[in-house]
């Protein structure tokens, strides 16, 4: 079996820095370990006041880095129960313990830009160590007072058509990307980071909560290659780390974001992937601490833990924290208690559909299930709302007709329904879009589309201006002008093929179906 210290994401050296980052231990806070059960450590103190809840403890270990733990319960007048934030290999009863006199404090400011940090703010990349005098902030902090908070009613344009049209994000608000495994949540979050840097020149703070080490490494390399790392802070608590580390990573990211909001008056994009792993880590911690589980095995404090995290994500006068959260939906069950608890706090719900991903409709965002409180005429304008409602109505009606089409064929529909089906399919394809972050894999340049161009394109499709276009001309394009050029090129290619066939004396065996953009035998109909 691999050494636990060797398998930890940042290694023994990083853990050593972790322990030193919480400050010097106070002499009166000396104690000793009396029990160790996995990540749970019971500590007895000989005299004086016990360490407060959430206070950090350091435990030296012979031949290894000190262990950092956090107090979570007072067992008696002389004993506390703490949760280790790192591997407990090598720890034994009787080991000395020091209380630090306060919660974990993490580095903030310009020094952390472009860096990858652990839950305690220790560098986990190949960069230089942080200066000893770098400013630090505690990870535990209350939300701003209600009188200081600013409502989120300004549009946060992303350049992603389907989001901007049907589930617009609020600057200073909270949005969540809900989806099962493999439907594109992380790619969508990466594209939003790219959009933030390109459009707003703001600060991005990324919290990697319980995700794969490989994905974290790839994200670091991608950001270096794209040039956005210099205005980004990465905070990782990966899936191979103890539950305490994964549980506290969002708080570390929040502390850094709050510094740039409060002290620098800078807009911050806070991205968290994956918030479900935060809930999952909390369930592990709850079990380790001996609490009885609630529904589906979740911790009894699920609602309060999610609320404590989400309520700290707030905007104040002069600066906004815009949160975009990826949320894994276990078994695609949107009634899961963790999913419903998170959904109650967000302004915009972006729902990713496995069925759309299977059809290649990327981003695989469900236009019917996604929603936003910003889709209001007073915020985005009447024209935007009218087009969004009509797009949703047409696609929803098409879905209602799909069973009839599958059983009886499209010919059994009336003329109006056939026309609606064609427009719905074209709308679905127009709402697909190539991403800048996938350009290296697809070979197609990413497209960022203004909201006005998205509305104009959807209105033209709804009006019937594109009824005789190939569906393929609208697939993976930016604006309608891009689709128009694609359609013109396809028609020119068809004309050349027909001319060549006529010159060679070939018969009219096949024709290119203008609706689908594919060659089909004469008499075949689109929509089978």
UniProtKB/Swiss-Prot annotation:
EC code(s) of this entry: 7.1.2.2
Gene name tied to this protein: atpD2
Enzyme class: translocase
Record protein name field: ATP synthase subunit beta 2
Recorded family membership: Belongs to the ATPase alpha/beta chains family.
Compositionally biased spans, kind Basic and acidic residues: 15-27, 488-499
Alphabetical UniProt keywords: ATP synthesis, ATP-binding, Cell inner membrane, Cell membrane, CF(1), Hydrogen ion transport, Ion transport, Membrane, Nucleotide-binding, Translocase, Transport
Presence of keyword Ion transport: yes
